[in-house]
């Protein structure tokens, strides 16, 4: 099943010169649009989470005509709202040695040297401005006793650089971006389309010129034309069925763009988050994240011996294994997510896991409560403790939390160059929907940073460069490509409704998730990837023969929405497994069991795989073709990650 085609080299359009000057130089080189002409250009923004709302707000403020789409009832329901722990920025307020260069180094190292250096440095460079923007918007970031902005630590760093709003950081930052966007809605520069789902990208003469959508209330299929399109639609880890993502999170917009010519980069780079509430049974439809910030004060441990079923309070210190402190003494409980997740799986596989099925480890706050008092811990994490008790019925102030790794974030995404432009001219991809900044493993508190960096501080410059070379309104929705797109979407809708099978959509999604978790999950191998590649097409064929989609297409129909998303997951999952088989190394969250160092850590193969693998869709009857973008590391030389 390995891909045998000759790879084509992709140009990331990386600026020349020293890394600290690249972004400043490029901004000076980019073409501009006359302020009086900006209102003649129309930009579509799909998705209104942190990346989408900040992009729509920024572009509207500049004077462009923006059409913003989201499938939620309100932009405030975007999944960015679920981010808990915080946002990184190189402000060095604690005076503990942080800098732009150190944030850059930590991020590249955390991603196991599989991210583009120039993009990561730019991210670190603009991080401080994000905090200034948020404060100016009134985002209630935590402050210390003196009134200064407070910081806490996160995984993979030896400094405190994470700004936060208790355990609701994503929600508060999203409200700031949302208010900025709604200001532009009021000003008339942004037009909002809620309850509207993108189902196709319209490409005319090789360039992105609009989208086709379905009104989720009426079922009406419509097309919208624009001079550029920004996809800000998040990640795809719901391909595993059970994940920390909201049930509505999907790959549909990105996958439909891929099928129109946008290459999909590194889809096998998926993050398994170490601190989630363990699954309680097969009836479950999603998992709940417990913020990484909890590991500032919580200690991860399991019984020292297999089969020890005593209550946690009855197990003395000498019979406990504080596994992260033992394995990674320099970083302790704040080791990066990929290695922390594998460490938890390792002890559970040894029979030392806790809770039902032995699939859990303890996250214990007793020492911190004894040192600081329960009131201090409540002030830092109160809403998280309340959430945990609501779900489990257990009081984490008196007994340790039980946690276990779960699918959480997608480092892979649509390939973009330094301008955030995909392989389709005019299609820009922001936030988690692109691949660019996190390599093979994202550090905690960096997702919010990337989404807002892309939306507030990158896309306003780079999209202008594209638009300055485009005649406004050159293509309208009257072009035949839009009618063809609508016809194709309507045909797929009718096909789904006409199957009339016996199995539910959830049944197929759960079956796909089991294949993915078992064969392409936390640990993979060539054999397991091949098994997934054999089973996914068979399941997909069953779906199109035996799924039952009730209702009609001319009204609100949640089953129809879910059926289309699962159909896309059934196609995308095959690409993810193929990429995992192709990447014959271990790096970050992509852990191939054949490739381990003697101590069990990931063993990279820089000679063969120090590159981005971007996949070109060639139709349902042909294997996708891989294209590569070589990665060079000049500022931070390649090295084996070491958190010990």
Language-model segments: which ranges?
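Glycine-rich Rossmann-fold phosphate-binding loop(s) that bind the pyrophosphate
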Residues: 47-50
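Short beta-strand "acidic-cap" motif of Rossmann-like dinucleotide-binding folds
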Residues: 65-70, 266
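Glycine- and aromatic-enriched mobile tails/lids
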Residues: 24-25, 30-42, 55-58, 62-64, ...
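Conserved redox-cofactor binding core of oxidoreductases
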Residues: 133-220, 232, 276-289
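Glycine-rich loop(s) and the adjacent beta-strand/alpha-helix scaffold that form part
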Residues: 228-283, 287, 355, 438-461
């Amino acid at each position: 099943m390995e891909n045998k085609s000759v790879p084509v080299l992709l140009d990331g359009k990386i600026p020349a010169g020293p890394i600290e000057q690249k972004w400043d130089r490029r901004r000076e080189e980019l073409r501009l649009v006359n302020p009086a002409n900006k209102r003649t250009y129309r930009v579509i923004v799909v998705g209104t989470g942190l990346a989408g709302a900040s992009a729509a707000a920024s572009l509207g403020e500049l004077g462009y005509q923006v059409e913003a789409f989201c499938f939620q009832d309100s932009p405030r329901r975007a999944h960015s709202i679920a981010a808990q722990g915080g946002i990184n920025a190189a402000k060095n307020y604690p005076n503990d040695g942080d800098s732009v260069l150190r944030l850059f180094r930590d991020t590249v190292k955390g991603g196991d040297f599989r991210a583009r250096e120039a993009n990561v440095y730019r991210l670190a460079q603009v991080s401080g401005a994000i905090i200034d923007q948020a404060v100016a918007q009134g985002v209630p970031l935590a402050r210390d006793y003196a009134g200064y902005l407070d910081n806490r630590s996160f995984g993979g760093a030896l400094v405190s650089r994470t700004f936060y709003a208790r355990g609701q950081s994503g929600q508060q930052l999203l409200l700031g971006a949302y208010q900025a966007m709604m200001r532009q809605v009021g000003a008339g520069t942004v037009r909002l389309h809620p309850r509207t789902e993108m189902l196709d990208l319209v490409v005319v003469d090789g360039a992105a010129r609009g989208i086709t959508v379905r009104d989720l209330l009426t079922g009406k299929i419509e097309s919208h034309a624009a001079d550029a399109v920004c996809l800000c639609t998040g990640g795809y880890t719901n391909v595993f069925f059970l994940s920390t993502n909201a049930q509505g999170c999907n790959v549909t917009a990105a996958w439909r763009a891929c099928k129109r010519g946008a290459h999909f980069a590194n889809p096998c780079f998926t993050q398994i988050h170490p601190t989630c509430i363990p699954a309680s049974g097969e009836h479950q439809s999603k998992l709940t994240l417990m913020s990484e910030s909890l590991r500032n004060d919580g200690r991860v441990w399991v019984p020292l011996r297999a089969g020890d079923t005593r209550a946690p309070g009855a197990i003395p210190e000498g019979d406990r294994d504080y596994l992260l402190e033992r394995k990674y003494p320099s970083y302790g409980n704040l080791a990066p997510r990929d290695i922390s997740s594998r460490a938890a799986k390792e002890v559970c596989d040894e029979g030392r896991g806790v809770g039902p099925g032995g699939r859990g480890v303890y996250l214990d706050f007793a020492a911190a409560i004894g040192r600081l008092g329960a009131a201090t811990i409540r002030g830092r994490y109160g809403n998280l403790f309340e959430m945990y008790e609501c779900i489990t019925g257990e009081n984490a102030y008196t007994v340790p939390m039980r946690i276990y790794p779960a699918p959480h974030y997608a480092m892979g995404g649509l390939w973009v160059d330094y301008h955030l432009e995909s392989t389709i001219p005019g299609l820009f991809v922001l936030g988690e929907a692109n691949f660019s900044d996190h390599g093979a493993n994202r550090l905690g508190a960096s997702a919010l940073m990337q989404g807002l960096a892309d939306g507030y501080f990158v896309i306003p410059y780079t999209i202008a460069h594209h638009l300055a070379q485009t005649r406004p309104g050159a293509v309208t929705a009257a072009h035949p490509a839009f009618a063809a797109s609508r016809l194709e979407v309507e045909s797929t809708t009718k096909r789904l409704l006409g199957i009339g099978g016996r199995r539910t959509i959830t049944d197929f999604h759960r079956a796909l998730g089991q294949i993915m978790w078992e064969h392409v999950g936390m640990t993979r191998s060539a054999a397991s990837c091949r098994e997934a590649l054999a089973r996914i097409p068979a399941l997909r064929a069953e779906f199109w023969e035996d799924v039952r989609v009730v209702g009609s297409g001319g009204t609100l129909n949640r089953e129809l929405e879910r059926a289309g998303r699962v159909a896309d997951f059934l196609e995308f999952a095959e690409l993810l497994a193929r990429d995992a088989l192709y990447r014959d190394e271990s790096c970050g969250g992509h852990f191939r069991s054949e490739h381990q160092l003697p101590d069990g850590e990931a063993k990279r193969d820089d000679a063969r795989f120090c590159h981005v693998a971007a996949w070109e869709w060639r139709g349902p009857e042909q294997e996708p073709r891989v294209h590569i973008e070589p990665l060079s590391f000049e500022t931070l030389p390649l090295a084996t990650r070491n958190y010990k």
